[in-house]
Amino acid sequence: MASTTALPPTVGFDLDMTLIDSRPGIRACYQALSERTGTHIDADLAVTRLGPPLADELINWFPAERIDEVADLYRAMYPAYAIAATPALPGAREAMSAVREAGGRAVVVTAKHEPNARLHLAHLGIEPDAVIGDLWAEQKASALREHGAGVYVGDHVGDVRGARAADALSVAVATGPCDPAELREAGADVVLTDLTEFPGWLSDHMNGRDNGGRPGYSPAARA
């Protein structure tokens, strides 16, 4: 009988560019923010570097003393411009289902403003067991630990850092701004092309199978 690897009680997922393609909605919101404030924002450039907190992007376009004010305005405008325009990424629903079918729990831990994160998930019919927002990179470790996450899935090197800070397995998907080489260099344990590969990886992981030779999988040794 094959040996098995126990499923962690919880699998965490990032949101932007992991579960959802938020570029169209965020682009539309930045364009509307630019019109509202009379400040130039290169929305096409901004959506190429999603992941870090909103303030990290706004500082490129607004003086430091206006960041809090503009961030509040952006978040207030966001539901009208970003929710309907944002689709789920391929495999997002199936990845959540795979965790549940395996007897686990799925939680979303994201840097996005939590109320807006919840709006995205509700609009797309994706129902995690918990949603925790407003956490970036190593800050995510607190929520991952609180929920007992043994795996964290994300698209950014910041997500890799968050997983490692929580002593969780880092599963990276190359659907965001960071390419596979960057994700591996940051310390990702596994790099997938996208979430369509996640159910197969999860099955292999639970059953202790080595994925090293399987296309799309790139396990990296933990430091």
What are these regions (language model features)?
Residues 4-93, 102:
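N-terminal helical cap/lid subdomain that shapes the substrate entry/recognition surface
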Residues 30, 92-121, 134:
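Substrate-recognition element of Asp-dependent hydrolases with the DxDx(T/V) motif
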Residues 110, 153-196:
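Acidic, Mg2+-coordinating phosphoryl-transfer loop and its flanking beta/alpha structural elements
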